[in-house]
Amino acid sequence: MADITDIKTIIYTEKTLGLQEQGVVVIQTSPRVTKNSLKAVLQEYFGVTPVRVNSLRISGKVKRFRGRAGQRDEIKKFYVKLPEGVSLENTEA
């Protein structure tokens, strides 16, 4: 089961700010987090039960640095639809 330390950040871009107007929050996590474990973390720490959770896995790109190949970290993003009138900003953690 995941815990609050597996949630890395809430993503703020032009696209996600538009989604926030519709009640959707985009959360970046470690790849081992599942939909059910994220729902449990949101319920336990924020007191919010999400309406819907969609996930997206992004594999790490291979990048070159000083002539050597390296790889970026793999991440997972969740699109979390919150109940109407609820946001993660106005909840206490």
UniProtKB/Swiss-Prot annotation:
- Sorted alphabetically, which keywords does the UniProt record give? Ribonucleoprotein, Ribosomal protein, RNA-binding, rRNA-binding
From the UniProt record, list the coiled-coil ranges: none
User: Superkingdom of the source?
Assistant: Bacteria
Q: List the GO cellular component terms.
A: ribonucleoprotein complex; ribosome
In the record, biological process GO terms are: translation
Q: Supply one GO molecular-function term.
A: rRNA binding
Family, according to the entry, reads as follows: Belongs to the universal ribosomal protein uL23 family.
- Describe its assembly: Part of the 50S ribosomal subunit. Contacts protein L29, and trigger factor when it is bound to the ribosome.
What the protein does?
One of the early assembly proteins it binds 23S rRNA. One of the proteins that surrounds the polypeptide exit tunnel on the outside of the ribosome. Forms the main docking site for trigger factor binding to the ribosome.
Q: What is this protein called?
A: Large ribosomal subunit protein uL23
